[in-house]
A protein has these predicted regions:
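Short, Lys/Arg-enriched N-terminal segments with co-localized hydrophobic residues
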Residues: 60, 64-81
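Short glycine-rich, Thr/Ser-proximal phosphate-binding strand/loop in the N-terminal lobe
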Residues: 93-140, 313
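Adenine-nucleotide phosphate-binding core of ATP-dependent small-molecule kinases
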Residues: 350, 357-361, 368-395
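Cationic, amphipathic, low-complexity segments that mediate targeting or membrane/lipid association
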Residues: 24-46
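Short hydrophobic targeting helices and cationic amphipathic motifs
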Residues: 9, 20-21, 27, 56-59, ...
Length: 395
């Protein structure tokens, strides 16, 4: 195994740009290090990674710990040939992809479903001659077993796409809510995990599951593989206060952080950038409206490369009509329902998150394929639901 490297990074934080390299001290012979940060730069307590082109002698810096000292793990599979495992963990599911960012190649993807129940595992290698696994029965009592199943498939002697776990250079995790704490993707440390947990009340259906995925990767892969949190909310941190503040007493914001945060930021950022690439226009000069439409949905206004407004709010419930989420609704209607139904806060959360939206209006399903079939059959509630769904997006 290659020797570990240590380097010290100190940045001139008095600089107005806060990204001027002040000193780099090599404590061991420099080798090739892996990239785990794709943002232009990320500042953590005065220590910064990037912009990488500012110091080409270190083309691929990696794992940064607080305290100005970073331990580096040399790449196992060559300078630009890094592999990143991307994880989107839900409460009972786990989506994954293995990618090579340098080439853009997708090596494999798949899904672990019904974790904690009966376990279904899907694996789709993208290399020629490799066989897929579809909804196989695999015991997954916890996310740890799900991650282990993913890794076993990736390194399988016959149908795997890599030779060993050492060829996975980093893991990227989708984390739904970063609150006001995170405006960029960050390397996961104990401090970062604690901050993510503090945001759990703002995304109780998502953040705990994301944390479970991170912990599962650590348990199965160990702590030497760097992990990065990519936040749904980060892209929207550029919204002005007049776009994100609610008309509630200001104390609610100061005490509890009640404001609009927005979600699907990674999707909106990618789609808007990709649209400009296809159109051949500069991203920083455009006004763009993007739509993320799925079981959850949101609309975002982007000006000069920055999110200036979005349809989701404090939680992913606000905005469009969604699969099981209600979207925009008069807050007074909710207090009215609570009074009439004798409902507590937990009951209300269940109503607006799990029993509303397309499923609640139609009485059929949250699956738009079933709604479309019912519309074709002339079902009046399905037709009404489809009209509401489309109108909310257009509005």
């Amino acid at each position: 195994m290659a020797a570990m490297e240590w380097i010290i990074l100190t940045y001139d934080t008095s600089s107005p740009h806060k990204n001027h390299l002040k000193m780099v001290t090599i404590l061991a012979p420099a080798k090739k290090f892996m990239v785990v940060i794709t943002e232009i730069f990320a500042i953590i307590k005065g220590v910064c990674i990037g912009p990488l082109d500012k110091f080409p002698q270190f083309p691929s810096l990696s794992y940064l710990k607080l305290g100005h000292i970073a331990r580096r793990r040399p790449m196992e599979n060559g300078g630009n040939n890094m592999n990143v495992l991307v994880i989107n963990a839900g409460s009972s599911s786990l989506k994954y992809q293995l990618l090579n960012p340098a080439t853009g190649a997708l090596l494999a993807k798949g899904l672990c479903e019904r974790i904690g129940i009966d376990g279904k595992f899907t694996y789709k290698p993208q290399l020629e001659g490799k066989e897929a696994i579809k909804a196989a029965d695999v015991a997954m009592p916890t996310h740890n077993e799900a991650i282990a199943a993913v890794l076993n498939a990736l390194v399988d002697e016959k149908n795997g796409v890599i030779g060993s776990m050492k060829e996975i250079d980093a893991v990227g995790h989708r984390v739904v809510h970063g609150g006001e704490k995170f405006a960029k993707s960050v390397v996961i440390t104990d401090e970062v995990m604690a901050a993510i947990e503090e945001c759990n009340p703002l995304a109780p259906l998502h953040n705990p599951a994301n944390i479970t995925g991170i912990n599962a990767c650590t348990a199965v892969m160990g702590k030497d593989v760097p992990q990065v949190a990519v936040f749904d909310t980060a892209f929207h941190q550029t919204m002005p206060d007049y776009a994100y503040m609610y008309g509630l007493p200001y104390e609610m914001y100061k005490k509890y952080g009640v404001r609009r945060y927005g979600f699907h930021g990674t999707s909106h950022r990618y789609v808007s950038r990709r649209a400009c690439e296809i159109l051949g226009v500069p991203y920083e000069d455009q006004k763009i409206i993007t739509a993320h439409v799925g079981n959850g949905g949101s609309i975002t206004a982007i000006k000069n490369g920055k999110s200036v407004d979005t349809s989701m709010g404090l939680t992913p419930v606000e905005g469009l009509l969604m699969g099981t989420r209600c979207g925009d609704v008069d807050a007074g209607a909710l207090s009215f329902i609570m009074d009439k139904e004798g409902m507590d806060g937990a009951g209300l959360s269940d109503l607006i998150n799990k029993r509303s939206g397309v499923a609640g209006l139609s009485g059929i399903s949250s699956d738009m394929r079933e709604i479309e079939a019912a519309v074709a059959a002339g079902n009046p509630r399905a037709i009404m639901t489809m009209n509401v769904y489309n109108y909310r997006i257009k509005k």
